[in-house]
A protein has these predicted regions:
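Long, charge-rich alpha-helical interaction segments
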Residues: 144-208
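Conserved small/polar residues in nucleotide/adenosyl-binding loops
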Residues: 248-257
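A positional "C-terminalness" feature that preferentially activates on distal terminal regions of long
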Residues: 198, 202, 206-247
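Short beta-strand element of the conserved SAM-dependent methyltransferase core
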Residues: 18, 32, 211-213
Length: 258
């Protein structure tokens, strides 16, 4: 349903097929992953530091909608992308996150596909209730090398920079996860730099829109460590029924719960 190649994220991942109850047809697919560690507009909105995110592990209480892809013609004719974006906030996702990882989900992030480059910077998330536009990413996105190029880069690192190779591709944390976060991109950028390859060849100045949905009225206070989990106050109804009605019924029969 998409021409984009799927690349599994390192860390947490929840996968969903969205299926219509009546017709049993597939409406789209969603993947909820470990959230981005650094998104300046979002981080400024929350008011947290990198130390709070990592040392106190508050980043584990947030997630990113890394894949939000509707099937067609639902996506084009019936704003299916907006439907899937709302379902990323659902009780189902929150409960699965808590059950599988043990952390309460308090907010959701996502980024637009095209950013400023298309449609005047508008995306399927604009003007969508419960999603706040934070701004744009800094706009430096690495191109993905072909498999053959990736293999040659790894072989080169292993031969000429064995310590770095071990750090990125062999060493593991006690949890079994890679020792270095985002190790593939880091290793590629290191190799490109050492080989004298110009950044304009391997990176695109492509800015993406950043969107954020706090699930509680005091999500930011919680992520800053100012309140405990038991003090969280629900921001809006996150049942599947409400979220679907919110998009396809106006006004929603349950819109009084905000």
């Amino acid at each position: 349903i998409s021409t984009a190649e799927n690349n599994n994220n390192v860390g947490r991942n929840l996968y969903y097929y969205i299926i219509d109850k009546v017709t049993k047809k597939y409406l789209g697919t969603i993947c909820m992953s470990s959230d981005y560690l650094d998104l300046t507009p979002r981080d400024n909105y929350i008011g947290w530091t990198r130390e709070k995110k990592t040392d106190d592990k508050m980043i584990n209480y947030t997630t990113v909608g890394s894949t939000i892809v509707p099937t067609q013609p639902l996506g084009f004719n019936y704003v299916g992308g907006k439907l899937l974006a709302l379902l990323c906030l659902s009780d189902k996702v929150q409960n699965d996150w808590k059950k599988l990882y043990g952390d309460r989900l308090v907010s959701v992030t996502t980024t637009s596909l095209y950013g400023k480059a298309k449609a005047g910077g508008m995306s399927q998330y604009d003007n969508l209730k419960h999603w706040k536009k934070m701004g744009y990413s800094q706009g430096s996105v690495a191109y993905k090398p072909k498999k053959e190029t990736t293999k040659r880069l790894r072989d080169w690192l292993k031969k000429y920079h064995s310590e770095k190779y071990f750090e990125w591709y062999v060493a593991l944390k006690p949890s079994g996860q890679p020792y270095k976060r985002d190790h593939k991109n880091r290793s590629h950028q290191f190799a490109f730099s050492k080989l004298g390859i110009d950044k304009s060849i391997v990176r695109s100045e492509h800015q993406r829109g950043i969107y954020y949905s706090p699930l509680y009225t005091n999500t930011c206070e919680f992520l800053r460590g100012e309140i405990s989990e038991d003090k969280l106050v629900k921001s809006f109804d996150t049942s599947t029924e409400y979220l679907v009605c919110l998009l396809y019924t106006s006004p929603s029969p349950r819109d009084s719960f905000r």
